[in-house]
Amino acid sequence: MTIDLILEKELKLFDKWKQQREFLCPDGIINFESYSKSKVKIMLLLKEANAVNEIVDFKDFLNNGAYDRKPTWENVLRWLYGIQNIDTDYNWSEIEKLFADEKIRTEYLKSILFCNLKKIGGTYTTNNFDFYDICIQDKELIIEQINLYFDNSLICP
């Protein structure tokens, strides 16, 4: 499937989703060029955004380095680096210095497919009953989104 077709289908999917969810937080492939160049295609599958009654566009957020909620995204950066450089021996302090560079940090974050199962935000702790109910209600849309991108992605829960 071409990039243009994926983007078109993604827009239609999120338009449909917005009819059901007022504060929908869109996600997906952050940057197609960076994603297509990455050695391993990674899909980061998370529960929900930490954003109550707020719309967070994760493509914008991650394309700009994800400087809000820094501890979460620094862990993600470590995972990405480790997965993309699995054959390399590296020193932990070198990795920390590497991601202090804004350009490198942003490039790594742009290389992923990011998907929250619950497309509306919650607090820093998930209400499991609410999460489960919404995932059941949105099951078909979640499956449609994953099928839109899925090829040989590695899914990291």
PLM segments and residue spans:
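Alpha-helical hinge/cap motifs
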Residues: F150-P157
